Amino acid sequence: MYEILFYRDQNDIEPVKEYLLSLAQNESKDSRIKLNKIRDYVKLLSELGTSVGKPYVKHLDGEIWELRPIRDRILFARLMDGRFVLLHQFMKKTQKTPKREIQTAQQRLSELKERLKNE
């Protein structure tokens, strides 16, 4: 079993967690479906790690992977201690994952590693 963490920035904001909370607060059927699907995918990641493979998980670049529920994408990485950190969320609108979304996840991962190193 793998531990799943939410990335938290210096202002104590957890972008992925906030997105999930916004889905939970929205009473639409579409939001409930998205939230349940994301929960299922995160559960699979916690149980099987990246070995769960496609269509659930896909390697993107370097240390960055993506969870692929419906059109939502949640970019994540595995930390040195084996835990996974959910870094960034976006809605997929194009065939290829936009570079800026991957760069956002990479920047957050670098910043997190720096903070962990200094603790």
Curated annotation (Swiss-Prot):
Cited InterPro entries? HigB-like
Q: List, alphabetically, the Pfam families matched.
A: Gp49
This chain's protein is named: Uncharacterized protein HI_0660
